[in-house]
Amino acid sequence: MAGVALKREGPQFISEAAVRGNAAVLDYCRTSVSALSGATAGILGLTALYGFIFYFLASFLLSLLLVLKSGRKWNKYFKSRKPLFTGGLIGGLFTYVLFWTFLYGMVHVY
């Protein structure tokens, strides 16, 4: 029975540096998608409620892609799934509005 490995039961040890690194990657992804979707909304000329709906759709799509990428072993990379869905959502909204209004003004106003 030398080929059978015993599965160790017990507490999981989590590296705090790895958790912070993963949070930084999530923040970078959320900021990048917010900037790109804001620029897209501005170029497309979306206004008012349609622009905000576009942001939340883009944010939901990013969250879905992050969940699919992390797979069933999400607990290997994160303490909970909540940061995948809500992490950086409000900060990303500010970035989105900045790019949205700037590109809308450059393309449709001037």
UniProtKB/Swiss-Prot annotation:
Native source species: Xenopus tropicalis (Western clawed frog)
Described function: Part of the endoplasmic reticulum membrane protein complex (EMC) that enables the energy-independent insertion into endoplasmic reticulum membranes of newly synthesized membrane proteins. Preferentially accommodates proteins with transmembrane domains that are weakly hydrophobic or contain destabilizing features such as charged and aromatic residues. Involved in the cotranslational insertion of multi-pass membrane proteins in which stop-transfer membrane-anchor sequences become ER membrane spanning helices.
Family note: Belongs to the EMC6 family.
InterPro entries in UniProt: Emc6, EMC6-like
Disulfide bonds: none
Subunit-level organization: Component of the ER membrane protein complex (EMC).
Gene designation per UniProt: emc6
GO biological process terms, semicolon-separated: protein insertion into ER membrane by stop-transfer membrane-anchor sequence; tail-anchored membrane protein insertion into ER membrane
Superkingdom as given in the UniProt entry: Eukaryota
Membrane topology, Cytoplasmic segments: 1-28, 72-89
TM spans (from-to): 29-44, 51-71, 90-106
Keywords: Endoplasmic reticulum, Membrane, Transmembrane, Transmembrane helix
Cell location: Endoplasmic reticulum membrane
Main location: endoplasmic reticulum
Protein's name in the database: ER membrane protein complex subunit 6
Entry GO terms, CC: EMC complex; endoplasmic reticulum membrane; membrane
Residue ranges that the UniProt entry lists as topological domain Lumenal: 45-50, 107-110
Membrane association type: Multi-pass membrane protein
Any matching Pfam family: EMC6
